[in-house]
Amino acid sequence: MKALLFGVTAVLVSLNVLAQDGGALGNNTGIVTRPSKYSVIETMDRVEAGAKGVGANIFARIDYQEMSKKVKVDIRPNQLLIFGRGAGGPYIIKEAPLAGIDIPFKALVWEDSQGKVWVSYTNGSFIDKRYAVKGAASFVKNIDETIEKIVGEALK
């Protein structure tokens, strides 16, 4: 009976952790998630301003909560920004066309079930490992530095 109780408790704790972190798949996904003290809208406004501030093109800003209303599904605030400067992305995509799934860069700002706001994005080093493009190290370093600058400033 103790073993069963322990097992049920472990499952419930695991499900709670997944619910709180947005259902993350684990560290091998390359997704970085950082907390924000601002609302989803304000956080995304700050991320977008930061992206523009480093000369990035804004390709799209998707409001999933607004979209969900059209199909009568209620979700917590959740927005995606697609942006890029076009410096390293085309080089990487030339060598590894599937990298177009990860490039241009994306930042997701979302609210968890506890009302906490988060910013998530894919680490450039993970993209480098995923596609193993020779000679891309400087581009990947630039991607990591740029997204860290954008998100870091947005969260101040």
Q: Which ranges hold each PLM region?
A:
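Soluble non-cytosolic domains of exported or imported proteins
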Residues: 34-42, 59, 134-141
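Compact, glycine-rich, soluble single-domain proteins
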Residues: 48, 52-53, 59-105, 109
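Sec-dependent signal peptide recognition
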Residues: 2-7
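Beta-strand/loop substructures that line and gate deep hydrophobic ligand-binding cavities in soluble
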Residues: 106-132
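C-terminal partner/receptor-binding element of secreted or periplasmic proteins
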Residues: 125-156
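Extracytoplasmic/secreted envelope proteins and their assembly/folding machinery
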Residues: 41-44, 48, 65, 144, ...
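N-terminal signal peptide c-region/cleavage motif recognized by signal peptidases
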Residues: 14-16
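Terminal, regulation- and interaction-focused segments at domain boundaries
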Residues: 20-55
